[in-house]
Amino acid sequence: MKHLLLVFSFLFLQQLQAQKIRLKVEDQKDTTVYLIKYFGSKLFYADTAQMKNGEVVFDGAKQKPGIVGLFLPGQRYFEFVYNNEEIQLSTKGPDFMANMVVNKSEENKLFIPYVKFISSKKGEIAKLAEQRAKLKPEDAEYATLGTQIDALNKEVEVYQANLVTNNPGKLVAKIVQMSTEIVVPEPPKDDKGNLLDSNFRYKYYFAHYWDNVDFKTDALVNNPIFANKLEFYFGKSMMIQHWDTIIKYAFAFCDALDPKSRMYEYSVGWIASTYGKSDIMGMDKVYYYMLKRYFCTKDASGKSPAFWVAEDKFEDLCENLDNKMNTVMGIKPPNLIMRDTSDTKWVDFYSLTSEYTDRKS
């Protein structure tokens, strides 16, 4: 029995050790530093610790997998990936990422070189694009620079594809895959070479937009890429900005998510908040319908699907909601019965035969 207790104690200590986040920043004075984390596109404080002799240790067991970072005095910070493993990173300023050394962490042995590679290629592409911007399309060098830019973009695509293919199951691979664009095939044509559907590219892209996102990996919501994709999906470039269209695809998207996941929490919350604050007339319909479906209803246990909302907040969110839903676009409003201007006859709203009513002063 004593032997078993020693074994279990050893395994427990090993598990705790395996989730430590050890970071070293050369020439950094002793100070208070912060571990920061993403939820969607926003950064939040995750933990606080004292850095001594340029070194700091955080307890990773307190954190959820995703992209996190070390926040230093002077608004300086650098990011890395946490996925329930021990991390040992060392770096120095002023360019923390360029000087980053991964001493321990399988995820960051993929992530840090990837970030460095992408940063390098972006710099090269930016320089070529700047040169090309000074030329006219008919200039010979214009086409040459375009070819060089295409070649660099191809290098990035190959790097990303290899990283994803060679590292199945790694969180970094899923993050990279999520960031890659869907490849749209050539549209079908008839025997004479005419397009069968002029909207084929858009329809295909829209239908396959989320193909590169693993919705079963909840950690993907803990970085800004998912948030940016969600915002673009519901934006004017992808979707008609009509309240009924937004509601249709919002319901379809959110209903397909795990209702206990943080991805569900973020998506439902973001959609409701975004259209609740919209200054576009009619978009309040999206907000009220989201409240009705995901906040102000009860499951079999009597709980709201919005598990992240404090109980004392539901009264404000749901108060008089049914009446509010009767005032939105496309819904027949409650009948009003009022005296006419002579104050002798009662007129009800539903009996008006005009297509529009006009109030003249």
PLM feature segments, named:
Residues 1-24:
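Bacterial Sec-dependent N-terminal signal peptides
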Residues 194-243:
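A recognition module on extended beta-rich or small alphabeta surfaces enriched in W/G with H and D/E
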